Amino acid sequence: MKDIHVLCINYNIRSDLRKALSSLNYILPRLNKVTVFDSQYPHTFSPDLKLPFDIDYINSRQDLGITLNNYIQTIENEYVLFLFTNDLLVDKIKGIPLTLEDDKPIMTVYYENKDAHYKLPFIVKTSFLKKSPFLLEREVPFRELIFHSWIIDKDESNIVASKGNVIERIRETPNITAKEKLEFAHKLKGNSYKNVPFIPTLSVMISNFNMEKFLSVAIQSCIKQTIPFDQIIVVDDGSTDNSLKFLERYKTHPNIQCFSKSNEGKAKALNYLLPFLTSEFVLELDADDWLDPDAVLLIKKYLINIPQNVSLLYGNFRYWTQNSSGDIGFSKIRKGKIIRNRKELLSYKFPLGPRIYRTSSLIKEKGFPIIDFKEGRLYEDVTILVHLFKKYEFCYEDFTIYNVRKHAGSITKKNHSDWNDFRKLLN
């Protein structure tokens, strides 16, 4: 009975894919078809590979989540078997019944190495997959998270673990990027923190201009928190891309408020949001960046004991670099430092942040100052910090929950040469 359709995903090395395809001979009596989702096509295509089953190649350079979800709707076999990147089947699988009951439609495999352990879908009932789509690639920081988040969101009662080691890795590829991605995925487990005080209250505000490629990642990172933000508030600053189209889907979310206005720069966009803030503190998030899943939890732990004369809490940044293929690579963690005077503030080596403002302090300062330099469209963060530092203290804590994406369209890259002129203006 040929009732299994195999999906091979994220194989970047042709020889690895050939080995994975050859290993499917172990399930040949059950194997109906194989589909390779190939972001490197035609690089990994092997026309000379002769195997006793049909193989389709799907170009997945576009959004892998969309491509997968659409393709799964066309599958007619009872089961889908997933193989990822460096996986191949081993002989032991011949002795394992690859069947699932209706109340246990998911079988997982367990991965473990010196850096982390995790599980991913292995065999899933096609009928269940069709009703339970994957997140889109534009909703997650990196494509591997599509599968981590899918399995984490599922009820444990629907899952059965594979019996024994049915797969092995063709090669281990330990690197700092893979390690950082796994650590991020682990934070998605959504542990319950019932004993964490929900006071003081915390919102997040996002100003967006033409970041349609990344906006959903930023918003989803605010939604998928281990404890929720008290308020998520987003303004589109006159984008000319499809950002407003993406924002439409969030307008019915109970904890998200979405606004749009004509383009006047980030400072005016953030000021537009201030009257709608209802929380004691607010985190500023750029539309091309994203948060760790435990961001609210960690921030609130520090806010509980913060002195009244502190108007700003800040910590460290985790930097990632966007490459031409659309994937991201880990760059570094830049640790913050304590600011004791104005000179140290203006000589800070990188943007001070992440910035968690006391809302009342922002309102007393009448929001982000609109200055003549570049029509107030640059360095609004530095301007407000200089104003706040005259009257209040800042608090640095050693925590890392904010992910900065460096890409071709980053404003800080485009306008780095303006920084010295801006500093002269402040002095």
Predicted regions and their residues:
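Short aromatic/hydrophobic "clamp" motif used to bind/position activated sugar donors
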Residues: 80, 282
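Conserved nucleotide-sugar donor-binding catalytic segment
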Residues: 110-181, 339-425
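A conserved acidic beta->alpha catalytic loop
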Residues: 37-46, 236-245, 286
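Glycine-rich, basic loop-to-helix element that forms the pyrophosphate-binding segment
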Residues: 60-75, 261-277
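Conserved donor NDP-sugar-binding/catalytic core segment of glycosyltransferases
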Residues: 87-116, 296-328
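N-proximal low-complexity "stem/linker" segments adjacent to membrane-targeting elements
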Residues: 1-23, 168-221
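Short beta-strand/loop segment that forms part of the nucleotide-sugar
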Residues: 32-41, 230-238, 259-262
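Short, acidic, metal-binding catalytic loop of nucleotide-sugar glycosyltransferases
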Residues: 22-31, 220-229
